[in-house]
Swiss-Prot record:
HAMAP family: CytC_Ccs1. Keywords: Cytochrome c-type biogenesis, Membrane, Thylakoid, Transmembrane, Transmembrane helix. It is found in: Cellular thylakoid membrane. This is Cytochrome c biogenesis protein CcsB. It is a multi-pass membrane protein. GO terms for biological process: cytochrome complex assembly. Belongs to the Ccs1/CcsB family.
Length: 428
């Protein structure tokens, strides 16, 4: 029993909770540094050649579950521990503190007033109804009062005492929601060409719809660096009687029937070439060996003796580079310019077709996350409300009225209110 009590004391301590939060923050940071949820070969190939900090190779990354941190045993165990710590702290400290603050404290003697932050006393007439008058005044000022025969207990801002408990509940909901989301959330990356349609099905809400990419554009800085990707999507559904167009950008997702659609990436998927008066639409693939965001395709050109040429492009506005794979010498081809003669073939670029990279995510934990944030914000705000307490004691023998006050926050503001009340009571 003693061991269990000591264990609860340690788990419910602020130091223990802060240690867990720091550990979770470090683990989350590692999770952003190490790519998550790839196959084992990816980690072996990448981290065997260049171990993390010179220590963690691919095998150790897999063994320590750093390839899926947010669903790993040790990370989820840490979340559970933090939930237990917050719950234990709430039951051991916050709830008893709240219960204690609900009880009315009596100050029956003038000696106790000396322990208060603010005290004052006034002479009174023996026959006056001072207690009733003071009680009425305090109620008009918004104070909750409890009147005894010769003294009054009053308080204001008791809701501030609930704040820390609400924050703890919000954090627990956040942790539970995050753990729930790590197991239940699903995401899919999809590249769409303008005019292409994707079927959306959300089994959790039993809703179906079609989403069509109407238009995709890229905003660039003056130096050509991509600034923003914009997709205009048409949502349609006969069952839902729906037909509307919505726009998604980077950091501006679309939420639709429990699904969230993010603008994540882009690619150049196709080009339209005219080769010797015949139109061809060629599909491109990314070529990381050449550079970042470079797409290309290998084609045969030549009216008599055919040769292989590599076509590469890195911008939706062009140019298209045509390179001889024998010596990698090449020429640039621009949209709708005069045809370029390559190995006796006439080649012209008619169209560059970029595709929009979208991530469709279904995360049932989102309502929990939003609700937890509301609780945390609400709890933090009401925690700032000071809890003020007043005690008034009438001593008919010494013909003196004593008033004392206590505040847990904003003593300067309470001091002004205290002396103003004291002066009003003095004028009775």
């Amino acid at each position: 029993m003693i061991i269990f009590k000591n264990l609860i004391l340690k788990i419910s301590s602020l130091r223990f909770a802060i240690s867990l939060i720091i550990f979770i923050a470090i683990a989350s940071g590692i999770g952003t540094f190490i790519p998550q949820d790839n196959n084992n070969k990816f980690y072996i190939d990448n981290f065997d050649r260049a171990p993390i900090f010179g220590l963690l190779d691919g095998e150790k990354v897999l063994k320590l579950q750093l390839d899926h941190i947010y669903t790993s045993f040790w990370f989820l165990f840490t979340l559970i521990l933090l939930c237990i710590s917050l719950a234990a702290c709430s039951f051991r400290r916050q709830i008893p503190s709240l219960k204690a603050s609900l009880k009315w404290i009596e100050y029956k003697s003038e000696k106790k007033f000396s322990k208060l932050q603010l005290t004052r006393s006034h002479p009174i007439n023996q026959d006056g109804e001072h207690i009733s008058k003071v009680d009425l005044l305090l109620k008009k000022k918004g104070w909750k009062t409890y009147k005894f025969n010769s003294h009054i207990s009053a308080r204001k801002g008791l809701i501030g005492k609930i704040g820390p408990l609400v924050v703890h509940i919000g954090l627990i909901v956040l942790l539970i929601g995050s753990a729930y989301g790590s197991f239940t959330s699903q995401s899919k990356e999809q590249y769409l060409l303008p005019g292409e349609t994707l079927n959306l099905v959300n089994e959790s809400t039993n809703s179906r719809a079609n989403v069509k990419l109407v238009d995709f554009s890229i905003e660039r800085e003056s130096d050509g660096v991509p600034k923003q990707f914009i997709s205009k999507l048409n949502f349609s559904s006969e069952n839902l009687n729906l037909n509307e167009i919505k726009t998604t950008k980077v950091n501006h997702p679309i939420r639709f029937k429990g699904l969230t659609i993010y603008q994540a990436d882009w690619a150049i998927s196709n080009i339209v070439l005219e080769i010797d008066n015949i139109l061809y639409q060629l599909q491109l693939k990314e070529i990381p060996e050449i550079g970042n965001q470079v797409w290309g395709v290998l084609v045969e050109l030549g009216s008599e003796t055919k040769k292989n040429y590599l076509l590469t492009i890195d911008n939706e506005n062009g140019p298209l580079k045509i390179s001889n794979i024998e010596n990698f010498s090449g020429n640039n081809l621009y949209i709708n310019e005069d045809p370029l003669e390559v190995n006796s073939s006439k080649v012209s670029l008619k169209k560059i077709i970029p595709s929009s990279g979208l991530i469709i995510k279904n995360d049932p934990s989102i309502p929990f996350i939003y609700f937890s944030f509301i609780l945390i914000i609400f709890g933090t705000i009401i925690s700032l409300i000071p809890t003020n307490q007043l005690w008034i004691l009438v001593n008919k023998e010494s013909q003196k009225l004593s008033i004392g006050g206590l505040s847990n926050k904003n003593l300067v503001g309470f001091k002004k209110e205290f002396f103003k009340l004291s002066d009003e009571i003095k004028n009775f």
